[in-house]
Amino acid sequence: MTSAPKSSFVLGHRHLLGIEGLSAADITGLLDLAGEYVELNRQVDKKRSVLRGRTQVNLFFEASTRTQSSFEIAGKRLGADVMNMSVSSSSMRKGETLMDTAVTLNAMHPDILVVRHHASGAVELLARKVDGSVVNAGDGAHEHPTQALLDALTIRRNKGRLEGLLIAICGDVLHSRVARSNIILLNLMGARVRVVGPSTLLPPGIERMGVEVAHDMREGLDGADIVMMLRLQRERMSGSFVPSSSEYFQFFGLDQKKLSYAKPDALVMHPGPMNRGVEIDSIVADGAQSLVREQVEMGVAVRMAVLEALARNLPNA
C-alpha cells in the first residue's frame, strides 16, 4: 500500500448530487486531492486502504461503460468491496419502484452508492432513503458532477488555471447533463463559458446561466481556449432536432478548419462516447490538440478523490 495523500480536504457534504451547491473551495479541494491520485495511478502500486471494509454499490439504471468502469476501478484502488448492479438484473424489471430499491439496498448497509438514472432528480430522491453517501453518476439531463470535475482537472493541468479561460461548449446542450454541470462549475471558478449550437439544441433562456450564446462555429470558437464537443443524444430526442447527421456535421461538427477559428493553442475535449463524423472527425479527435484520452485518465483520479472525500465523513472514518 502507498502512503496517504498529503491533502486533508474533507467535503462538507454527505452526498455529491451535483456541482450546484458546491463552493469554489470544495471544487479546489477535490481537484487538489485528485491531482495526487493522478500521480498514484501512474505508479506500479496503485492501491490505498482508505475504503477497506467499506461497501460501494454501483447502481446504474442507464447503460454505461466508461463511467461505471471508472467508478469500479476507483473504488477497488481505494480498497472498497465493489458491487455492480444494473437495471437489467434488478427487481426494477419486475416492477419494484426506485424507492423500494433504495430501501432494500439500505437494509444491506452499503457505505457508498454510485447511482445513474435516466430521470432528472431521481438520484436525489434515492439519497433521501439511504443512510450511506450517494454519488450522482448522471441523472437525466440534470447533472453529471464527476464529469465536470474531471474536465476541470484536465483543463487545469493543461492550462494551469480555470479563471479567465474561454470555454466553448458545442453541440447538443439541450439534452446534456455534462454541459449543465460544466457551466455551473466553470462559472463558479471564474471562466467564461460560451455555448454553441443550433437553436433547437440550446435550452431556452440559457443566457440566464451566465453564458454567451452563438449559433455558428466561426463566431462560437473565436478566441476559445478550450473547445468542448458534446455527443448528439438522439436517444433523448422525441422529434427532428437536426435534419441529418451529415448536415449536422457540416455546420457543427469539429474538423481542422473549424478548430482553426479558436486560439492556435486551443485544446479539444469530449466527454465520450464520441460519434466520429457527427460531432467530431477522427483527425481532430486523435490529433495533437485532443485531450480526450487524458479525460479518461483524470476520471479515475477524480472519482477516487470524491470517494475518499465522502468516506472521511462516514461513521468511524
Swiss-Prot record:
Pathway: Pyrimidine metabolism; UMP biosynthesis via de novo pathway; (S)-dihydroorotate from bicarbonate: step 2/3. GO terms for molecular function: amino acid binding; aspartate carbamoyltransferase activity. InterPro entries: Asp/Orn_carbamoyltranf_P-bd, Asp/Orn_carbamoylTrfase, Asp/Orn_carbamoylTrfase_sf, Asp_carbamoyltransf, Asp_carbamoyltransf_Asp/Orn-bd. The keyword Chloroplast does not apply. The keyword Transmembrane helix does not apply. Keywords: Pyrimidine biosynthesis, Transferase. One of its GO terms (cellular component) is cytosol. Carbamoyl phosphate binds at residues 66-67, 116, 144, 147, 272-273. One of its GO terms (biological process) is 'de novo' pyrimidine nucleobase biosynthetic process. It holds the Pfam family OTCace_N. Disulfide bonds: none annotated. L-aspartate binds at residues 94, 177, 231. It catalyses: carbamoyl phosphate + L-aspartate = N-carbamoyl-L-aspartate + phosphate + H(+). Its EC number is 2.1.3.2. Catalyzes the condensation of carbamoyl phosphate and aspartate to form carbamoyl aspartate and inorganic phosphate, the committed step in the de novo pyrimidine nucleotide biosynthesis pathway. Heterododecamer (2C3:3R2) of six catalytic PyrB chains organized as two trimers (C3), and six regulatory PyrI chains organized as three dimers (R2). Belongs to the aspartate/ornithine carbamoyltransferase superfamily. ATCase family. This is Aspartate carbamoyltransferase catalytic subunit. It comes from Afipia carboxidovorans (strain ATCC 49405 / DSM 1227 / KCTC 32145 / OM5) (Oligotropha carboxidovorans). The gene is pyrB.
